[in-house]
Amino acid sequence: DAPDFNFEIHKKLQKKGIKTVHVVCPSVWAWRPGRVKQFNYVDYMLCLFPFELEYCANVNKQAFCIGHPLMDKQKDFENDDKENIICIMPGSRKAEIQNNLEVMIDGFNQFNFEEKYKAIIPIYKEDDKYLIQDKIQKHKNITFANVESSEILKKAKAAVVCSGTATLEALLAEVPTTVIYKTNWFNHLVLKNLMMSEFVSIPNIIADEEIFFELLQSNATPENIAHDLNSNLADYEFRKE
């Protein structure tokens, strides 16, 4: 986290002749491409994705791909026995939960009017438990579980997740997924001007095409979430691939 702060440290250490390694390569392929100039302050860059090596090579920076840590857990996401479960992942930060969970709940309820499905929210942090519990207590088909997200995703037939690492987890679990993201207008304006891609989820950015449905800001409505859930499940095998 805080790469801008870390690069300032690299800069000071470089002046003292101390060699440094930066873990991990900033996502200059997704937003703020000008940050690539800061790579000159480090001696070695460690990357999560192979294609990031090219960005380092463009500024003559020696780099190595160490792989994304989630790949070490790939087997945790494997399971052929799917259940009538929708995995809801509203984000790992309190602001994300506040901004995204309610519309996710409403979207699931509209989709689940026949009550054939159960939604489960994996809890990342104990502190989030009470916030989530307060928001779902009146919804009988929605619950939470204090388990690794892989435990829910590998059983789910579809997922609704907040943009972030959760999208990679859903990809590993081969779960047809709708990505949503709602934030305040100021953050949205700033991010919109800094983003290089038309997409916000990592799988879509890497593929440069819509692997997962994305619903952002005003498009993240209960109606659209319900529609996407129906679409994902109606063509389950295709969306899974």
Where are the predicted features?
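Donor-nucleotide binding loops and adjacent catalytic segments primarily
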Residues: E96-K155
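Charged active-site motifs of nucleotide-sugar-dependent glycosyltransferases
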Residues: D81-C87, Y117-K118
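A donor-sugar binding/catalytic signature common to diverse glycosyltransferases
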Residues: V147-L194
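Short, hydrophobic alpha-helical segments
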Residues: L229, L233-E237
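Short acidic-hydrophobic, aromatic-tinged amphipathic segments that line or gate anion-handling sites
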Residues: C47, F64-I66, T143-V147, E214-T221
